[in-house]
Amino acid sequence: NEQYRSVGGRAVGGFIMMKSRRRSAEKGKKMHVGEIMTADCANGIGMRVTVFVSGCRNHCPGCFQPETWDFDYGKLYTPEMEDELIKELSHPYYDGLTLLGGDPMEESNQEGLLPLLQRIRRELPEKNIWAYTGYIYERDLVPGGRKYVEGVTDQYLDLIDVLVDGPFIEAQKKITLNFRGSTNQRIIDLKETRKTGTIVLDPLNN
């Protein structure tokens, strides 16, 4: 079944299993990937390829993947892994790519993922891109924000269609929410937000 092929790891029931390596994060380390999920329908509209990058400083209580807080968890992201991701995503049954973690808005992850997103826009422009972050868009991802990287963040955000932002708050957990875990989190139409300069929520917010 093509929906269960391996991308840089061993495919098991739609999941790409990565060999874990637990070490403390060090500044300047190259991006690691904890898991790649194929045939994913839970993290965005339609059928998706989902990349769980490693590294997160939010450490939200109740996080469903605390092992991915470690920046060195999983496997080193390589050009070969990127090629396999592009090949997998090129299948017509995929609607797009989702970035999860860990947190794809950590500085090193922005830098590591930017070339992948640029390739998708060049080679697979029909695919949409979603990203999840525990950070808050207008506080952390704008000039002067704690996750804003000069020369990187604006390019990166301009390539993303939908951003789900905000930390997971266990006391606000609600299982009926669309594509998010707690009521404080927002599904942002990032294209319209970037165009208008004001937060535009996606109709999927419920």
Please provide the spans of the model-predicted regions.
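Structural recognition of alpha->loop->beta junctions
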Residues: G144-Q172
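Conserved Radical SAM active-site core
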Residues: R22, G28-G34, M47, Q65-R146, ...
